[in-house]
Amino acid sequence: MQRKAITSVLFLLSLIAGVLPLQAQKDNRFEVSKNLEIFNALVKEVEMFYVDSIDIEKAVRRGIHAMLSGLDPYTEYIPEENMGDLQLITTGEYGGMGALIRQRGTSGEGVVIAEPYEGMPAALAGLKAGDLILSVDTTNTSGKTSDEVSRLLKGIPNTKMTLVIQRPGEKKTRKIDIVRKQIIITTVPYYGVYGDSTGYIYLSNFTDKSAQEIKEAFEDLRQNKHIESLVIDLRGNGGGVLESAVQIVGMFVPKGSEVISTKGKIRQWDRIYRTSIEPLDTVMPLAVLINGNSASASEIVAGGLQDLDRAVLIGSRSFGKGLVQAPRELPYDGKLKVTMSKYYIPSGRCIQQLDYTHRKADGSVAAIPDSLTSVFYTANGRQVRDGGGIRPDFEAEEPDLPAMLYYLTNDNILFDFATDWAQKHITIPPAEDFTLSDDDFEALKAFAKEKNFTYDRQSTKVLNQLKDVARFEGYLAEDSTLFSALETKLTPDTEHDFDRFKPEIKKILAVEIIKRYYYQRGEMIENLKSDIILEKALQVLADKELYIQTLRAPEPQP
C-alpha cells in the first residue's frame, strides 16, 4: 500500500513537472502577445494625437535599443542599412576605398583620414592621414558624423567616386577620383621572429579568414625562418567568429579535441565543438599573450590552449566574455544579433565575468567576485577557475600611460604634429631602425605651445571636490594653508610634464609618424621594440624547464 502511494505521488509530481513548463510557456506567450498589442496601439495613438509630428522610425528604434540594452551589451538590432558592418565583422570584407576615418574634435571640425590601409585604393590614390574630407561625389560632408561619411564612402566594388579634400598646409583643395574595390582586411597584420628562434604572430580579430591567415604565417615562420617556439598575441583582440577560434586551437592540439561546448535556452541547439583538422604542430613550445581587452573568441583560443595544457598564457586577466551571439532574420532585411548561449572551455568552466541576469537596483551589473568562483582542472590536473576571465600563467602588467598623453591625443596635438612632420620628410629609415630625435621632441613641445595646449590633471579635479567637502563641513578656512600647498603642487606644469614623460610621449609620437610610411606593420614593429609582455614570453620559452614545469601536473600532496 505504501509503495502504491509513493508511486502515485511520483506520478503526480511527474505530471505536475510536465504541466508547469507548458503552463509557463502559455503564460509567457500571452504576455508577449499582450505587450505587443499595447505597444502597437501606443505607437498608433502617439502618432495620431501627439501635438507635434513624430519620426516614428527613430522613436521605435529608441524603444528597441532601450529594450535590448537592458539585456546585455551584445544583443542588438541591425537594420538593413547597417548590414555592411555585420559583414565586415564576420568576413573582414567591404566595398570601399580602404582607409580608417575619424571625427576631428567635437565641434563639427569635420571628418579626416586617420589611416589609409597599405595597398588599398585610398593609399594608391595618394590620400594621406590628416586629409579633411569636404565632399563625396555631390554630397557635402560638413556637419556629418564619421559613420555618415563612412556610408558615403562604401559601395559596390568597381564603382567610381570623387572626393574633395583639404590637405593641411595647402590653400587649394584637391579633387581625387577613386574606384571602390572589395577591401579585405587582414587579421594578421604582422608576424616576425624575435629572440634567437621564436616566431611571433599578432591576430587583431577573428573573421572567417583568420585561421587560414594564422596557418600561412605559421608555415612561413616554420619553413623559412626555422622557428623553434611561437608567440600568438591576442592582446586587444575583442573576438569575432567562434568557428575560427576552434580552427586555430585545432592547429596545435590533436584532431578530435573538444575546444568548447555551448549551452542555451533551446537545448536542441546546444553544441560541442571539436577540432576537425590535422594539427600543424602539437609539440612546439607555445605562448599566448592576453590582456583585459582580449575577449570572446580570444578567450576561447587562450582558455582552450590553457585547459589542454598546450600553451602558457602571459599578460593580465582577460575580459571575461563567456556569451555567444547568433544572427536571427527580421522583416525588411534587418537582423537581430542575440545572445543565445554561454560557452564552456575544455575544463568545463565558463569565464563570463559580468552577471547580466542579476542586476543591482540601479540597473548596474556586478562582476562575479573571485570568492564565488569554482575550481576546475586542466588536462594535466592544474587548477584553473571559472568566472572573471582567463587568468594567465605568468602575470605581467603593461605600464600605465600618463594622463597627459590622453590629452595630447584627444586634442590632436600628436596627430597634427605627425602630419606636419611627414610633409617635411619624404622618406624615413626602415621601421626597425627609426628613432625620434631629441630635436624632434623639442619641436613637438614648441608645436604644442603654439597650439596653446593645456590640460587638467584628475588630481586637481579631485582636490577641488575635496575643497567643496571641506567648505561644507566648515574646515576650509582652517585648512587653507594645506589646500594652497596642494593646489600649487598639483597645478599642471606643461613644460615640466613634457620632460617628465618624455620617453612615453616619444614612443607614441614615433608610432604615429611610422604609420604614415609603413602603415599597420610599421606600427606593430615600433610597439614591440620595448614590450615587456613579449619579453616575458621570450624568457619563459627560452627556459625549457620552466615551460615544462608550468604545464606539468602538480605533485601529489602527502
Which positions does each model-derived feature cover?
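Structural motif
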Residues: 130-132
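Bacterial N-terminal signal peptides that target proteins for export
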Residues: 1-9
